[in-house]
Amino acid sequence: MAKAKGNREKIKLVSSAKTGHFYTTDKNKRNMPEKMEIKKFDPVIRQHVIYKEAKIK
């Protein structure tokens, strides 16, 4: 039997400081349909900045 396709989708979190740094994660599209914004550490500038969701190419 084939497995059902999951609700989780892989996303990329890109730094708003324009350093080029990003994190990859996944999120449940059903529970969180809006774009994710989260404050995380950017090691390039050594500060906490807002990371915004982008599609993985």
Curated annotation (Swiss-Prot):
One Gene Ontology CC term in the entry: cytosolic large ribosomal subunit
Organism domain of life: Bacteria
InterPro entries: Ribosomal_bL33, Ribosomal_bL33_CS, Ribosomal_bL33_sf, Ribosomal_zn-bd
UniProt GO molecular function: structural constituent of ribosome
Keywords: Ribonucleoprotein, Ribosomal protein
One Pfam family hit: Ribosomal_L33
UniProt GO BP: translation
Family from the record: Belongs to the bacterial ribosomal protein bL33 family.
HAMAP family to which the protein is assigned, alphabetical: Ribosomal_bL33
Protein name listed in UniProt: Large ribosomal subunit protein bL33
